[in-house]
Regions:
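Charged (often Lys/Glu-rich) extended helix/loop segments that serve as interaction or gating elements
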Residues: 145, 160-259
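Short, electropositive alpha-helical surface patch
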Residues: 96-112, 138-147, 176-184, 242
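Glycine-rich beta-strand-to-loop/alpha-helix junction loops that act as flexible
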Residues: 90-92, 121-131, 163-168
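Active-site-proximal beta-alpha core segment in soluble small-molecule metabolic enzymes
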Residues: 1-120, 145
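Short, well-ordered secondary-structure micro-motifs
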Residues: 55-58, 96-98, 131-134, 172-174, ...
C-alpha cells in the first residue's frame, strides 16, 4: 500500500520489523525519510500504474506512478541509501495473463533507465478465481508467462520475485451461509448483503449458490430478488437468484467460493 500514516510507518518498522515499504509519490518517500533512517536493509518498493483492460476491477487510477515518475523515485531512494524494488498490480480478477507481461516489461523499462538493480519485483495480486460467470480452470498459464517474462529480463540472481495471491489461493476455503429472514412473494431478505461480505457481487462475480437444509424443498425453481438486512434499497443482490420455489423464512443459503 503506497499511502500510510507516519505513525503506521514508525510502528511497522520499530514494533513489527517491517523492512519493505511501498511508495508511488515523492511525498510518501519524504515520510519514509522523516521516520526511518536510510539503510540498504530497508527496501523502498516503487509501485507502477499499469493500464490494461484484463481485470474486472482496476486499481491503477488510485495507486501507481507512471514510468517517468517511477524512474525518479528509484533514483532518489537509491541515492538516499535505501535498497529499491518495483511493483505493480494488474487489478482484481484479471483474466488476461498478458497483463502481467506488460507489467514486467514496464518494470524492466525502469530498471534499464535507472541502472539500479532491484532487491525485489512484486507482480502483485489479481490472479483470477473460478466463478459461475467467469470460469478460469487454472492459473498455470499466468504463472508460466510470468516466469518466462522474468527469465527474459535477466535480473540479478539475488532479486526476489514476489506475488500476492488472494482469491486464487483462498476462494474455495470459505463459504458464506445466510439465513432467510423474510419471504415476500418473489423477494427474500437475508441477514447479510452488499454492505457486508457480499460486496464483491457488485463487481459482477457470481458465486455458486445452494440451499443447505436437511428438510426437503421443491425441485421447482423460481427467480428471486434478494435483499440484504439494511434499510437501503441499494442493498440488493445484483442478479436474480434461482432458488426452490417453496423457500421460506429460516432457510439457509450457502454462497460458495467467497474466500
Amino acid at each position: 500500500h503506497p499511502v500510510k500514516a507516519r505513525v503506521a510507518i514508525y510502528r511497522a518498522y520499530q514494533e513489527y520489523g517491517v523492512r519493505h515499504f511501498v511508495v508511488d509519490h515523492s511525498a510518501e518517500l519524504t515520510k519514509l525519510i522523516d521516520v526511518i533512517p536510510p539503510s540498504r536493509n530497508i527496501v523502498v518498493i516503487v509501485r507502477l500504474a499499469i493500464e490494461h483492460g484484463g481485470a474486472i476491477y482496476e486499481l491503477s487510477s488510485k495507486f501507481g506512478a507512471d514510468i517517468g515518475a517511477a524512474v525518479e523515485l528509484v533514483r532518489a531512494a537509491d541515492q538516499l541509501g535505501y535498497a529499491t524494488g518495483l511493483a505493480f498490480h494488474v487489478g482484481s480478477q484479471c483474466v488476461d495473463a498478458q497483463a502481467y507481461r506488460l507489467g514486467l516489461e514496464m518494470v524492466n523499462n525502469v530498471v534499464e533507465q535507472t541502472s539500479v538493480a532491484p532487491a525485489c519485483i512484486d507482480v502483485g495480486g489479481g490472479f483470477p478465481g473460478d466463478y459461475v460467470n467467469s470460469p478460469i480452470p487454472t492459473i498455470v498459464p499466468f504463472l508460466e508467462l510470468i516466469d518466462q517474462t522474468y527469465r527474459e529480463m535477466q535480473m540479478p540472481t539475488d532479486c526476489e520475485l514476489l506475488c500476492e495471491p488472494g482469491r486464487a489461493l483462498c476462494m474455495h476455503g470459505e463459504s458464506l451461509v445466510l439465513q432467510v429472514h423474510l419471504r415476500k412473494n418473489d423477494m427474500i431478505y437475508l441477514n447479510d448483503g452488499m454492505y457486508g461480505a457480499m460486496i464483491e457481487e457488485k463487481l459482477g462475480l457470481r458465486m455458486p449458490v445452494r440451499v443447505v437444509e436437511s428438510r426437503p424443498f421443491s425441485d421447482m425453481v423460481q427467480a428471486f430478488k434478494v435483499f440484504g438486512p439494511t434499510c437501503d434499497a441499494l442493498d440488493v443482490y445484483p442478479a436474480l437468484l434461482d432458488l426452490p420455489s417453496d423457500i421460506r423464512e429460516g432457510a439457509w443459503i450457502e454462497f460458495q467460493r467467497i474466500g
